[in-house]
Amino acid sequence: RLLRDRLAAGPVSLAVDIETTFHRGESRMLVAEFPGAARPDERVVLVAHVQEPGANDDASGCGTLLAAVLAMRQAIAAGAVAPPDRTITVLWGDEIRGSQHWLDADPARAAGVIAMMSLDMTGENTALTGGTFLIEKGPDPSAVHDRPSDPHTEWGAGEVDPAWVRGHYLNDLHLGVCLREARDTGWVVRTNPYEGGSDHTSFTRAGVPALLNWHFTDRYYHTNLDTPDKTSPEEMGHVARAVATTALFLGSVGPVDREPLLALVREAERARLETERRNAASEEILEAWRTWYAQARASVEALR
């Protein structure tokens, strides 16, 4: 009542002291797996983080990942696809710390990871939130060389260890899957250079080919206005289908897939070099891309 009376009389300024404490506690992680039928010690890992309280960040990522898992389970149970040769491991936990703990807890297990995808803010109703769906690529030369054809998001460029910039087919494979999903639906798919800040960071630092599925920029990001009315089931469906498709392909990719994968990577290399030449890239940048794509082709040729 006193505060109401003061407010009725005019503007009121408040000074507030808040006492807080920090303490250690347990952090739980939910782990689900599709056991590998032929190479169970080799793994594809999918991750969404649970600790952010927003609807898009990251309830939508957790829900999208669950939808992808249920779709894979249904397809395998129905005989539409074969069980994966490799184990597909699914993690819901604390962002970055949870992923790092999973990697550190069993180095032998971590050594078997062939690829990882993170799902973060995957359910945006972009008409309300702004931004678009993005694939944040595993580190390639665009993470080091700022180019007009490959701009960073408002999140901003992060520090990149040169050792992380190693070519792999994962970027172009997942982009191709997403573009196929978009072909008949009008889904907007774009990419951005590696920036870090979600669960793919832990795996990238560990030398694992990794990428992020997300949306940015979101005008409600990290505010109490990140609410369910700003999510889109259709957008979550697009991401879930693309992630499930890529994960199942990675789960059994082998020598029989070399030629189509090589064709995909070669076409991506051709398009990239053409774009960089058109934008007057230096010879240093062109050579960086040639090197990266040579490594990406080698990652395909190494399939066994």
Please describe what each predicted stretch is.
Residues 4-8, 70-77, 104-108, 179-183, ...:
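Sec-exported extracytoplasmic/periplasmic mature domains
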Residues 256-304:
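Acidic, Ser/Thr-rich low-complexity intrinsically disordered segments
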Residues 1-56, 67-80, 87:
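Soluble metallo-hydrolase cores and metallopeptidase-like ectodomains found primarily
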Residues 54-63, 233, 237:
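Short, conserved micro-motifs enriched in small and acidic residues
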Residues 71-101, 109:
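Short helix-loop-beta-strand segments that form the rim/entrance of peptidase-like active sites
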Residues 21-24, 37-39, 50-54, 94-99, ...:
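Solvent-exposed loop/turn segments at secondary-structure junctions
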Residues 86, 219-270:
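His/Asp/Glu-rich mid-to-C-terminal helical/loop segments that flank catalytic regions of hydrolases
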Residues 39-41, 93-212, 232-234:
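Metal-dependent peptidase/peptidase-like ectodomains
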